[in-house]
Design a protein with these regions (language model features):
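Walker A/P-loop nucleotide-binding motif
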Residues: 1
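Short, well-ordered coil/turn elements that cap or connect secondary structure elements
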Residues: 12-14, 111, 153
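Conserved substrate/cofactor phosphate-moiety recognition/catalytic segment
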Residues: 11-65, 126-132
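Glycine-rich phosphate-binding loop used to anchor ATP phosphates in small-molecule kinases
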Residues: 52-151
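Conserved phosphate-donor/acceptor-positioning beta-strand/loop module used by diverse small-molecule
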Residues: 118-120, 137-179
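Walker A/P-loop
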Residues: 4
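Hydrophobic anchor at the start of a short beta-strand
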Residues: 16-18, 115, 156-158
Length: 179
C-alpha cells in the first residue's frame, strides 16, 4: 500500500524526525516486540545464552517489563523468532483487558513530537481485535473512543493511505513477500 515507501521518503526529507518502523521499540506500538517480565527475560537469556548479549542490545526496561525488538536480532538459531512471538501482546497472547491497558497506557505516556511511526495506532491493534479477540465493530469503536480521548490533546497527525486498487496491491505484496 506504500507505507514503507512513504516512510523512506519522509525519513530522507525530514532527517530531524525519529522514525519508528514496525519491529522497533516504539513509544506507542509494540508490534514484533516481546513484552516480558524480568523472570521471562532471564529464562530466555538462559535458553538462548549464545545471543544473550544481542538480546540485551535490543531490549529496554519499562517499569516491570522487558521489551525486546527480537526481529532485529540476526541469528541462525532455528525457532528463536517463533519462540519470541509468544511474548508479544498481539495475536491473542494476552487477554483483551491487559492488551487494552498496555496500549492505552502507552498512548497516555506518549508526549514526544518529531516522530514518524509506521503501522501504528490502527493496523496491528485492529487486526488483533478482529482476528484474535473477535470483537464487534461497536467494541472496536469503543476502544478507539477511549484512545481518541487520550490522544486528542497531543500534537500529531495521522495519515491514511488510500489504496485505489486493492486486488493489484495485494498481488504486489504477495510477490514482494513470497518468502
Amino acid at each position: 500500500a506504500g507505507k514503507s515507501t512513504l516512510l523512506n521518503k519522509l525519513q530522507k526529507n525530514m532527517p530531524e524526525y525519529k522514525v519508528y518502523r514496525e519491529g522497533d521499540i516504539s513509544p506507542v506500538e509494540l508490534a514484533w516486540c516481546s513484552y516480558m517480565t524480568s523472570e521471562q527475560y532471564e529464562e530466555v537469556c538462559i535458553q538462548y545464552r549464545d545471543i544473550c548479549a544481542d538480546l540485551g542490545l535490543h531490549t529496554v526496561t519499562e517499569e516491570d517489563r522487558k521489551i525486546t525488538a527480537y526481529t532485529q536480532i540476526l541469528t541462525d538459531i532455528l525457532g528463536f523468532h517463533k519462540f519470541m512471538e509468544q511474548f508479544e501482546i498481539y495475536n491473542g497472547n494476552i487477554d483483551f483487558k491487559q492488551f487494552k491497558e498496555v496500549i492505552l497506557k502507552r498512548y497516555e505516556k506518549f508526549n514526544e513530537i518529531g516522530n514518524v511511526f509506521e503501522c501504528s495506532f490502527f493496523q496491528n491493534s485492529i487486526e488483533c481485535m478482529i482476528l484474535y479477540y473477535q470483537m464487534s465493530d461497536d467494541e472496536i469503536m469503543d476502544f478507539y473512543s477511549k484512545a481518541f480521548d487520550i490522544l486528542k490533546g497531543k500534537k500529531f497527525r495521522l495519515l491514511y493511505l488510500k489504496v485505489m486498487d486493492i486486488e493489484s496491491t495485494i498481488d504486489t505484496i504477495k510477490r514482494e513477500r513470497i518468502d
